[in-house]
């Protein structure tokens, strides 16, 4: 059907970066590498400014919060006029704890995106190219903070701190710890 093809074309021509407003969710740290990884704190306005000058597609990138619903709203392509934002910004209510924010752009001029990872990452096996075909090079002021996982290996911790400080000397680095008095995580500022 034409409507279904339009939806598939929309999905294929839209770039989306999924982020969260929370850095201390036990569930999210457990999902994503069992507390061994990092959480990067970004300045949303700086990210949008950095992206705007690199893409000349149909629209500038924008950030929006995800809406969570219990019922999947399937469009009737002959009657409904759902905006594409509704389709790209709706997720199952079960994921509400993520407090997701998405940065979206439609039909970007991808020639301005990076294909090669920065030199400092070339020796590391950290990029899954099955998922990432291009990326947007961001200016250093986009990066405000790094949160290091509770179970991060010491050698990775040292590497991440070194890279973060080269990227942005003003970046704040936090070590996540388990709160001994409650079922929650705390971020403790790392003195460098």
Labelled PLM ranges:
Residues 1-192:
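Catalytic-core loop-and-flanking beta/alpha module that positions acidic residues
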């Amino acid at each position: 059907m034409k409507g279904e093809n339009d939806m598939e074309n929309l999905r294929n021509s839209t770039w989306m970066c999924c982020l969260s407003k929370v850095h201390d969710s036990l569930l999210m740290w457990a999902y994503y590498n069992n507390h061994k990884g990092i959480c990067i704190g970004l300045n949303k306005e700086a990210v949008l400014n950095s992206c705007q000058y690199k893409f000349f597609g149909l629209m500038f990138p924008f950030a929006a919060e995800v809406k969570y619903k219990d019922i999947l709203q399937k469009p009737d392509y002959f009657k409904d006029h759902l905006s594409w934002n509704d389709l790209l910004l709706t997720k199952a209510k079960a994921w509400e704890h993520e407090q997701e924010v998405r940065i979206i752009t439609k039909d970007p001029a991808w020639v301005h995106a990076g294909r090669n990872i920065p030199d400092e990452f070339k020796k590391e096996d950290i990029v899954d190219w099955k998922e990432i075909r291009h990326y947007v090079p961001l200016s250093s002021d986009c990066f405000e903070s790094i949160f290091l996982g509770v179970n991060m290996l010491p050698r990775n911790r040292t590497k991440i701190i070194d890279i973060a400080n080269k990227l942005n000397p003003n970046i704040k680095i936090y070590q996540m710890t388990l709160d001994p008095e409650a079922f929650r995580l705390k971020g403790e500022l790392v003195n460098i």
